[in-house]
Amino acid sequence: MMTSVTDLGSILGVWAHPDDEAFLSGGIMAAARDAGQAVAVVTATLGEHGTPDPVAFPPHELTEVRRHELDRSLATLGVHTHRMLGYRDGGCAAVAPEHGASRIMQAIDEFEPDTVLTFGPDGYTGHPDHRAVSGWVTDAVLATNSHARVLHATAEHDFLSRFHDIHDRFNVFFAGKPSVNRITDMAIHAEWGGSVLDRKVLALAASGVRQGP
């Protein structure tokens, strides 16, 4: 297990929707930027269907709201390098895998990361967009012969038990998800405090439409 975020080197996060980056890697990105590491993020969709109130926030209006929220989240974490792929929210599984992978290959060639952060094959929450993006990343890294290590977001039992009620209330996970791993089996595990935790919370709060009142 790596003991420090600095062991990750330069980082490329590849996620499906705005707020995935904050929820699954906000602490890592903030700490890495504090340490002077290069961090870039790729987002597959604008999450235009990601609201509990689609009447108040129809997709054609929500697009710009989510874009603004994502910009604010990344700025809070100190990340200023971002690429948007522009796929339809909820439609990543319908994208030809080779097309999605080619877009990730472009990002890998551009940023030459030491580490790529993304979803595991189960998509962490089980969302089809997440699972599709995970496959694109795997195919892209293999196709580019990149030296980058790929790390998947995962969960451990104590975390799931501690926040079980919250996860249920907000329907965070599909049935049977996420996969559970022991901390000793993880590539890196950290518990954040201080300014790093503060910034992760603020980055999550930026996604106000997604979270609801």
PLM features per residue range, with description:
Residues 2-12, 90, 94-213:
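Metal-dependent de-N-acetylase/amidase catalytic core
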Residues 1-112, 139, 143:
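Active-site rim/loop-helix segments in enzyme catalytic domains that contact anionic ligands
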